[in-house]
Design a protein with these regions (language model features):
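Generic structural hydrophobic/aromatic packing signal, biased to beta-strands
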Residues: 49, 166, 175, 212-215
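Conserved S-adenosyl-L-methionine
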Residues: 1, 171-181
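Conserved nucleotide-binding/hydrolysis micro-motifs of P-loop NTPases
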Residues: 6-8, 54-57, 152-154, 180-183, ...
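Flexible, glycine-/basic-rich loop-and-beta segments that form/coincide
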Residues: 185-254
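Active-site lining segments that contact anionic ligands and/or coordinate catalytic metals
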Residues: 45-46, 142-146, 170-173, 188-193, ...
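SAM-dependent methyltransferase catalytic region
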Residues: 1-167
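Extended hydrophobic-aromatic, low-complexity segments
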Residues: 59-62, 147-148, 156-160, 175, ...
């Protein structure tokens, strides 16, 4: 269905277009039934989402950015003393804690200084980061998602807030590193697939400590030019021939 996923506030304008409606009206009717609020296109009740969001380009429109928590950054402003009556918490806050701070909580650092959180709206943000938040809004509690992300999102120090945000909203089930040839010839960006399940009191109760499955793809499935690598077999004459499945299709090596 042709909709700007990130700009959900304008969906109601899009669906009024006659040409669009002729093509997608049936799909739109089904999608509307999954909304948690019939008057809003923000939150849905999807059981499963599988996503490969676009990596290229940043979102720069302030109207869109303002709808997303992940378009904000957190800084800690130093105070001379803790304000009287303030709730003082030891240690640096996580990104979700800073987002939910109503201004009454002050944080005492390891050096003894006091800090208060300060949020700043970014002027641009990578699309894949916003898609993480958007897709989590699509999921119902207990719903599961698999999403392809650049490898850097998992280990860059600058993406710590993203990782904290994900861990706050869902259980990380697995991270599978893909081979660098997987998306060739279009891109050679190293990627991983993140598998998560949204926290839910019954289906996925929130816990602080749990196991996460990690794996790395060993077979490239494609060569360096981006052509698929197929499995071969030896026929009765001793010749090396392509291996076919029960439908007569070539089998990709994986």
């Amino acid at each position: 269905m042709h909709l700007n996923t990130l700009d959900y506030e304008r969906w109601d304008e899009t669906v009024k277009d006659e040409i669009w409606s002729d093509t997608y009206s049936e799909g739109w009717k089904k999608l509307k039934k999954l909304r948690t609020d019939k008057n809003s296109n923000r939150d849905f009740n999807f059981d499963i989402i599988m996503a490969n969001p676009p990596f290229a380009g940043d979102v720069k429109e302030s109207r869109i950015l303002a709808k997303y928590d992940l378009s904000r950054s957190v800084s800690l402003e130093k105070l001379k003393n803790a304000p009287q009556g303030a709730n003082v918490v030891a240690g640096e806050p996580t990104f979700p804690e800073a987002l939910n701070n109503n201004g009454e909580t002050v944080y005492q650092m390891s050096d003894g200084t006091f800090r208060k959180t300060k949020l700043k709206q970014a002027s641009n943000m990578s699309r894949d980061i916003l898609f993480v938040e958007r897709n989590l809004d699509f999921l119902k509690p207990g719903g599961r998602m698999a999403i392809v992300l650049p490898q850097g999102r998992f280990n860059n120090s600058s993406d710590k807030s993203l990782r904290e945000y994900i861990a706050d909203r869902c259980r990380i089930l697995a991270v599978v590193g893909l081979h660098g040839n997987v998306f060739k010839p279009h891109t050679g960006t190293k990627t991983s697939v993140l598998f998560v399940q949204k926290w839910d009191e019954e289906l996925c109760p929130k816990v602080d400590d749990y196991n996460i499955f990690f794996a790395t793809m060993q077979e490239p499935s494609k060569d360096n030019s981006g052509d698929k690598i197929y499995r071969n077999t030896i026929d009765e004459d001793g010749n090396n021939v392509p291996l076919l499945d029960s439908h007569g299709h070539l089998i990709v090596k994986h």
